[in-house]
């Protein structure tokens, strides 16, 4: 499922996935042959709480149109409290994005377990659709790295 508009633009989406749950869910989606957009670039992280909000800002600076963080369900974290820390960090991130004028819809946090391959694929498809409707992220265009 590749979304391209009339000018040939395809959204660039970065997905930060927890090693213990969401990355395994992505693997299950792939091995089950469930489709999600090829323009979703997955980056494996040890735990969702290890995602520094600056990594999300850097992704936007480098040309991402949307960033999604996927982690274990609350109360089911491999590191016990990791996703509770994630909630606090992401609330800080959302206030930074508001300050910068970047639409909040361009960033999402989802809880996907290792057994939820179908949910992972559906989440990525839904997020890609949302980003496609929002269009290209031009807010940080002057800061983007040239290709």
Model-derived features: where do they sit?
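Iron-sulfur-associated redox domains of electron-transfer enzymes in respiratory
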Residues: 1-147
């Amino acid at each position: 499922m590749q979304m391209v508009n009339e000018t040939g633009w395809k959204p660039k989406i970065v997905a930060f996935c927890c090693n213990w749950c969401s990355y395994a869910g992505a693997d299950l989606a792939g091995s089950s042959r469930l489709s999600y957009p090829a323009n979703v670039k997955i980056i494996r992280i040890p735990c969702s709480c290890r995602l520094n909000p600056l990594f999300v800002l850097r992704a936007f600076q480098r040309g991402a149109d949307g960033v999604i963080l996927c982690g274990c369900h609350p109360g089911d974290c491999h590191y016990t409290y990791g996703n509770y820390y994630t909630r606090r960090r992401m609330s800080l991130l959302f206030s930074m994005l508001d300050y910068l004028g970047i639409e909040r819809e361009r960033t999402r946090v989802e809880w996907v377990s290792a057994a939820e391959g179908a949910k992972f694929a559906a989440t990525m498809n839904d997020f890609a659709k949302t980003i496609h409707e929002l269009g290209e992220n031009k807010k940080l265009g002057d800061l983007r790295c040239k290709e």
